[in-house]
Amino acid sequence: MQALILVGGKGTRLKPYTSSIPKPLLPVGDRSILEIILAQLKDSGVDEVVLAVGYMAHLFESFFQDGRRFGLNISYSFEEEAKGTAGAIALAIDRLEDDFIVMNGDLLTTLNYGKMFKSHQKKKAAGTIAIFRREVKMDFGVVEFETNSMLK
């Protein structure tokens, strides 16, 4: 199973903390956010990861290298110029199989990625989005439902 993790952003909303370290590398306890995500993905059956890097790419390469010490095969897709989620996917698409996970590298969750992936394949869905219903209004990442499983 493969995952494309988007880690190329500048983390501007967290400045000054992200001035010298990208948000996915910020520590939570004794590990970085991205280390926690990689462990969760590995536990869910992911064995190959492509990191879509941009901002401070050298830090990701230096720390994660080929992924061997994390029990994963990690490669890198380099964005010279940030082109958003679609641009990062387009740049890495030749390395990915038909079904793969795309996720942000700064989002911690208890989602079972393996279970979601199996459900996606079982339904032969064109795409599957993991979301969390909130009552608190937010300015970004808003999803509206038509039914329980269909989006507007």
Predicted regions and their residues:
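Conserved core of the sugar-phosphate nucleotidyltransferase
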Residues: T110-K152
